[in-house]
A protein has these predicted regions:
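Histidine/acidic-residue-rich, glycine-tolerant segments that coordinate divalent metal ions
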Residues: 82-84, 89-99, 106, 123-242, ...
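Metal-dependent amide/peptide-bond hydrolase catalytic core
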Residues: 216-408
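Short Gly/Pro-enriched turn/cap motifs at secondary-structure boundaries
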Residues: 53, 137, 181-185, 340-344, ...
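Acidic/His- and Gly-rich active-site-bordering loop/insert found
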Residues: 2-100, 105, 109-126
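Non-cysteine beta-strand/loop elements that form the S-adenosyl-L-methionine
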Residues: 76, 191-193, 361-366
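General structural feature for long, well-ordered alpha-helical segments within catalytic domains
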Residues: 2, 13-20, 33-44, 71, ...
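Divalent metal-coordination and catalytic microenvironments
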Residues: 24, 62, 75, 104, ...
Length: 408
């Protein structure tokens, strides 16, 4: 079968891909709490003839091929949504206060589509394709949970690929941007800072210790790390995303809790940032007669892309979609007049897989601003062009089959 025939076969399943995606979009779950999604994906795989196995807290694994000896190619899709109400103008919007605002419903639908293609061509697969349906990417816990449960073993994975759709890119839907070799996504760490004071009546602040004032100064102080303690080359982002404290306008509360994330590309910078955040928060709190406790929660390392796998992937996608539908990030940037592609500031827990086996991450354009896809990921009004679904499913399946055939 030619690449063109393979693409046409993928396009013939477009209606089913859209049906899958819209069900998943309308029934989102978050973190590991994705029962509706899990049940749907499992049933679809069984109906195709797979024998899906649960992996970790809420993951699924299925195998295609295995009839011929060869290597193992892992394809990964994340399944979780975000804890935010949807405002997108679509008929299939979610109504449960959660939303697929990052496109994970698209990823899951595409991998189901790839599973359908792989099953139809199972006798042609040299080796095995392992399908990884993963929960809890948004909290950076799902990938590592599945790794600890053995997703990369039995059979042992040789290489891995993930796709992430991107809305609002000025590129035709279905254009693939393949990460170059090296680090493409930063390490990420969630943190909380609990500032403990002493509550009192708002008219008599002298009788208490105001944690809100201390927290405000801590927020300001933390910004000085980047401004005055990191070198220009020390790429890092520190964001406070939540502030919780108090319940009445005339009462100074006992405590305030801040929450946020840090993103870094270098482990030394990551460690330094954590140390200084703790020192600054504790020091400022003490100066206001309060105390501060800094804790770091879930996170993920940097995502490292394999240069050889990147080159192969670009070549395969060009066979499938054409020369103008696949670029490395550096190639795309050179076309725009810049010499080097900027790194993304968004983290991705597929990084855990990339630390274990040669891996590649690619972005798939899913709607231009001119066509009305003007909101970014994580926005309550974001929408994705479903025309990317068939192309994404074809990329998943074709890339795996081509790589396996060349590396038997």
């Amino acid at each position: 079968m030619t690449a063109e025939e393979f693409l046409q076969e993928a396009l013939s399943h477009e209606d089913k891909l859209i049906t899958d995606r819209r069900y998943l979009h309308a029934h989102p779950g978050t973190e590991f709490d994705i029962q509706d999604t899990l049940a749907y994906v499992k049933k679809e795989l069984i109906d195709m003839g797979y024998d899906p196995k649960e992996c970790g807290k809420a993951g699924l694994v299925a195998l295609a091929g295995g009839k011929k000896p060869g290597k193992v190619f892992l394809l990964r899709a994340d399944m979780d949504a975000l804890p935010m109400p949807e405002e997108a103008d679509v008929d299939f919007a979610s109504t449960n206060g959660k939303m697929h605002a990052c496109g994970h419903d698209m990823h899951t639908s595409m991998l189901l589509g790839a599973a359908r293609l792989l099953k139809a061509h199972e006798d042609e697969i040299c080796g095995t394709v392992k399908l990884m349906f993963q929960p809890a990417e948004e909290v950076f816990e799902g990938s590592n949970d599945m790794i600890e449960a053995g997703v990369l073993k039995n059979p042992d994975v040789d290489v891995a690929l993930m796709i992430h759709v991107m809305a609002g890119m000025p590129l035709p839907t279905g254009t693939a941007i393949v990460c170059d070799g090296g680090v493409s996504a930063p390490a990420a760490d969630y943190f909380t800072i609990r500032v403990q004071g002493k509550g009192c009546h708002g008219s008599m602040p002298n009788n208490g210790v105001d944690p809100i004032t201390a927290a405000a100064h801590i927020i300001t102080g933390l910004q000085e790390i980047h401004a005055r303690e990191l070198a220009l080359s020390d790429e890092a982002v520190l964001t406070i995303g939540t502030i919780h404290g108090g319940g009445a306008s005339n009462v100074i509360p006992d405590s305030v809790e801040l929450g946020g994330t840090i993103r870094t590309y270098d482990e030394d910078v990551r460690s330094f940032l954590k140390t200084r955040m703790t020192e600054i928060a504790e020091g400022i709190a003490t100066s206001f007669r309060a105390t501060a406790e800094v804790s770091f929660g879930s996170g993920c390392p940097t995502l490292t892309n394999d240069a050889d796998l990147s080159a192969c992937t670009v070549s395969y996608i060009r066979e499938l979609l054409g020369m103008q539908k696949a670029f490395t990030a550096d190639q795309l940037n050179a076309m725009s007049g810049d010499k080097k592609a900027p790194k993304t500031a968004g983290s991705e827990d597929f990084a855990y897989v990339s630390q274990k086996v040669p891996s590649i991450m690619l972005a798939l354009a899913a709607g231009t601003p001119d066509a009305g896809y003007c909101y970014p990921q994580h926005h309550p009004k974001v929408k994705f062009d479903e025309a990317a679904l068939a192309q994404g499913s074809a990329i998943y399946a074709y890339t795996a089959m081509r790589w396996l055939s060349e590396h038997c």
